[in-house]
Amino acid sequence: MWFKNLQIYRLPAPWAITAEQLETDLAPHAFLPCSSLDMQSQGWVSPRENGALVYTLNKQIMLLLGTEKKLLPTTVINQVTKIKAAEIEEQQGFKPGRKQMKELKEDVTDELLPRAFSIWRQTWVWIDPVNGWLVVDAGSPAKADEVIKLLIKSVDKLPLDTLHVVQSPVAAMTQWLLTDEAPSGFTVDQDTELRSTGEGKATVRYVRHTLEAEDVQRHIAAGKQCTRLAMSWADKISFVLTESLAIKRVAPLDVIKENTDTTAQNDDERFDSDVMLMTGELSRMLADLVQALGGEQAKK
């Protein structure tokens, strides 16, 4: 298994916490299925089938957030409420008032919830306490925030911070394209997005298209800046760096795939192998990326 997206946070390096302590902290917030009246439920689930909420290997930690959400469209609630309101109007001789309609809508929701379908999703969390990384495999900050909020609620005085670098991703990516020179250890791939800083926010996107230096430089000279850039690191991992320092479309390249343990006998052994390989390579990639962005800002 490999993370596809990286929402990156910082912890002290090293972060002194044991798996046993973290397990104790997470246990009160373990996932419970929705009750008949719940629209949504979230909590920690076991990354493997052994029931433990904390998976550890080679000093790396994996957590898994489970989310169940009931599918009850507003249109359905409104339709049923409208039918029941008409029945009440016929009985009492006048239309229900605003307060009565509000109560009726709540009653309809409670009535329909037990019959609503559920959808489930899982969000992976990787903690590297040695190097001080906390990474959420989420495609959007909102999804990552769900994890962080529950983690802060679970772990007392969690020493978590956002990642602050000296040079903004936008400035760095624009400079790399302007000079036609990627930072050491990285290469620029074929996808990019250039956006104007003006009111119109004019945007140019290259998708699987060779980036011609003169063409890109012309757009930059016209006032556009790079907001997304496809890159590869050490010929091992491809990804897209965004203006917010989120990393998307993470994928191991052939060199990594060739190192995958083919001797694994079962799912647990394959999972162990994948985690060890992924966390080791991503930890090194993140360190190199921070260096390419001028290093981390000094804490005030």
Swiss-Prot record:
Belongs to the RdgC family. InterPro entries: RdgC (IPR007476). One of its GO terms (molecular function) is double-stranded DNA binding. This is Recombination-associated protein RdgC. May be involved in recombination. Coiled coil: none annotated. Keywords: Cytoplasm, DNA recombination. It comes from the Bacteria. PANTHER family: RECOMBINATION-ASSOCIATED PROTEIN RDGC. The lineage of its organism: Bacteria, Pseudomonadati, Pseudomonadota, Betaproteobacteria, Burkholderiales. Pfam families: RdgC. It is found in: Cytoplasm, Nucleoid. GO terms for cellular component: bacterial nucleoid; cytoplasm. One of its GO terms (biological process) is regulation of DNA recombination.
